[in-house]
């Protein structure tokens, strides 16, 4: 392949994730994005809890029951001359750690906001994570077919609370039962709303020009007059779109629509392929890697078990940072210093797998993993370096785990270590007893772990409360002082799933006192993989 052909392939890639508060419509919009990208023929109406139609992107058993995205799926589809990689992130508020890590693998994010509710808690947290890397953000104001808040008010709230300038690209005409469509500020066109449920994409009627009398006929004179006045205010008060400000994460283009009614999603996708960046450079511990480089590099940001119920396998999700992947390629796993031949990499369509012949910078590929790959692993064509910025977050909730059948201790430990390697939960083994303590960022993770232990490892476990309120990874350059610290605090020390030493504190007061007592010891809230 010539350098110009390779450059063309990379330039076509757009890799993004959707962030939102639970129930803002993220899973529905994921479905409709795939529908407009022709990736699925039927957008299964999401979350008819208990219905036989399940969203294509929610496919683990527990997700099917609850109607929430617990795992991170990857979907690739063509749109507008580009190849789009969509990383679906857990929408439920308990799954932040997995979601955080997924955000390290994308070049752009789509923020979905329920226009009736505005900025919600989960959105704030996820925006903080995107801020760590100044990720560009597009915004979709959803649920226009319901009664919503004043759109100007919601934009002000986004600007104030999320510290990002808003630039409306489309603007709604009416809402709820009076929702008539949206006007595109830069194309001077009105798209009239016709609801399209499920997998039908309606032919949209377009009225050209803001002062076209056809608009008055289509939406009614009163509404048309009111809309034109509103638009004057909007154009005077809002920011013009600035591509550089978007790329630096300082400004977000805003689109309006209703994902459930299949309306407005294509306008947002048009903006995404036109403005979102092609694969971006990434930092390693030795240098910056740019997508145009000829040699293959990539990093693992997620490991998922049980993607195929018939085979108890695990798949490592790898983001290609540079170069071209080809079937049968020999790659170096930097952490283990081993060369491996990758003959059966996968590409995904949420649970449907197909074997992959090639992939380029920006793509996500799946590697079969029999316990040898960990989150944060870097793969190269020989160069020794490690991609940085793929963190573990200190858990906030803890439980002691006990077996119903004491003879299954070995299976329990194996299951917990594997689940911790894929980031589903963190495991701590205290140095002074045989307890197993699991730590999570949200309550639902405990449920996921117990149901997976049962279905994948045939282990029935129960949780008990434990006197731990927080954990920190500890390290120290002074060997003598570290030994003294370990000797005097042994009762509060534990090893995590990767055998890293951790301090498990019964209270925040205890942690603060210990930190003051041992200033030379570093207590870390996050740990690089």
Swiss-Prot record:
Spell out the subcellular localization from the entry.
Cytoplasm
Which GO cellular component terms, listed alphabetically, does the Swiss-Prot or TrEMBL entry include?
cytosol
Q: Which Pfam families match?
A: EF-G_D2, GTP_EFTU, RF3_C
Instruction: Spell out the PROSITE patterns in the cross-references.
Output: G_TR_1, G_TR_2
Q: Which domain of life is it from?
A: Bacteria
Q: Name one GO biological process term.
A: regulation of translational termination
Q: Which UniProt keywords apply?
A: Cytoplasm, GTP-binding, Nucleotide-binding, Protein biosynthesis
Which molecular function term from Gene Ontology is one that the record holds? Answer: translation release factor activity, codon nonspecific
User: Do you know which InterPro entries this protein is assigned to?
Assistant: EF-G-like_DII, EFG_III/V, G_TR_CS, P-loop_NTPase, PrfC, RF3_C, RF3_dom_3_sf, RF3_GTP-bd
Binding positions for GTP?
Answer: 20-27, 88-92, 142-145
Q: Where is the tr-type G domain?
A: 11-280
Function of this protein? Increases the formation of ribosomal termination complexes and stimulates activities of RF-1 and RF-2. It binds guanine nucleotides and has strong preference for UGA stop codons. It may interact directly with the ribosome. The stimulation of RF-1 and RF-2 is significantly reduced by GTP and GDP, but not by GMP.
Q: Which NCBIfam families match?
A: prfC (TIGR00503), PRK00741.1 (NF001964), small_GTP (TIGR00231)
Q: Which HAMAP family match?
A: Rel_fac_3
**Protein family according to the UniProt entry:** Belongs to the TRAFAC class translation factor GTPase superfamily. Classic translation factor GTPase family. PrfC subfamily.
Protein's name according to its UniProt entry: Peptide chain release factor 3
Tell me what organism the protein belongs to. Answer: Yersinia enterocolitica serotype O:8 / biotype 1B (strain NCTC 13174 / 8081)
């Amino acid at each position: 392949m010539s350098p110009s052909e390779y450059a063309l392939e990379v330039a076509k890639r757009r890799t993004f994730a959707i962030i939102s508060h639970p129930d803002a419509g993220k899973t529905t919009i994921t479905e409709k994005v795939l529908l407009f990208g022709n990736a699925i023929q039927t957008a299964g109406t999401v979350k008819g809890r208990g219905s036989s139609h399940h969203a294509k992107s929610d496919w683990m058993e527990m997700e099917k029951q609850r109607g929430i995205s617990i795992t991170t799926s990857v979907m690739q589809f063509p749109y507008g001359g580009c190849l789009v990689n969509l990383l679906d992130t857990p929408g439920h508020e308990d799954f932040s750690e997995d979601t955080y890590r997924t955000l390290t693998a994308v070049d752009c994010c789509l923020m979905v906001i329920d226009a009736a509710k505005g900025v919600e808690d989960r959105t704030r947290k996820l925006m903080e994570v995107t801020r760590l890397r100044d990720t560009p953000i597009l915004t979709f104001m959803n649920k226009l077919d319901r009664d919503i808040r004043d759109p100007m008010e919601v934009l002000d709230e986004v600007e104030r609370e999320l510290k990002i300038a808003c630039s409306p690209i489309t603007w709604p005409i009416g809402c709820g039962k009076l929702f008539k469509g949206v006007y595109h500020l830069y194309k001077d066109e009105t798209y009239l709303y016709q609801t399209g449920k499920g997998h039908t994409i309606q032919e949209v009627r377009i009225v050209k020009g803001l002062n076209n009398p056809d608009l008055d006929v289509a939406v009614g004179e009163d509404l048309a007059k009111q809309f034109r006045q509103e638009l004057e205010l909007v154009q005077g008060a809002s920011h013009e779109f600035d591509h550089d400000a978007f790329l630096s994460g300082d400004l977000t283009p805003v689109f309006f629509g209703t994902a459930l009614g299949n309306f407005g999603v294509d306008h947002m996708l048009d903006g995404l392929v036109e403005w979102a960046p092609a694969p971006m450079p990434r930092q390693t511990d030795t240098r910056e890697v740019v997508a145009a480089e000829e040699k293959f590099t990539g990093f693992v940001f997620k490991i998922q078990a049980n993607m195929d119920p018939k085979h108890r396998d695990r798949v490592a999700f790898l983001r290609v940072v540079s170069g071209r992947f080809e079937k049968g390629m020999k790659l170096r796993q930097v952490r283990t210093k081993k060369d491996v031949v990758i003959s059966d990499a996968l590409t995904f369509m949420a649970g449907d797998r197909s074997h992959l012949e090639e992939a380029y910078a920006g793509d996500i590929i799946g590697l079969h993993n029999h316990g040898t790959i960990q989150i944060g692993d870097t793969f190269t064509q020989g160069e020794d370096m490690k991609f940085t910025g793929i963190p573990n977050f200190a858990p906030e909730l803890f439980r002691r785990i006990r077996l119903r059948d004491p003879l299954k201790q070995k299976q329990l430990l194996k299951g917990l270590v594997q689940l911790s390697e894929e980031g589903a939960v963190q495991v701590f083994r205290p140095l002074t007893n045989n307890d197993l303590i699991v730590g999570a960022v949200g309550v639902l993770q405990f449920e996921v772990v117990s149901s997976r232990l049962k279905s994948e490892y045939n282990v029935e476990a129960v949780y008990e409360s434990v006197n731990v309120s927080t954990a920190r990874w500890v390290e120290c350059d002074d060997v003598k002082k570290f030994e003294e610290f370990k000797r005097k605090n042994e009762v509060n020390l534990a090893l995590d799933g990767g055998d890293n030493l951790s301090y498990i504190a019964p209270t925040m007061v205890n942690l603060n006192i210990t930190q003051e007592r041992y200033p030379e010891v570093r207590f870390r809230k996050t740990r690089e993989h």
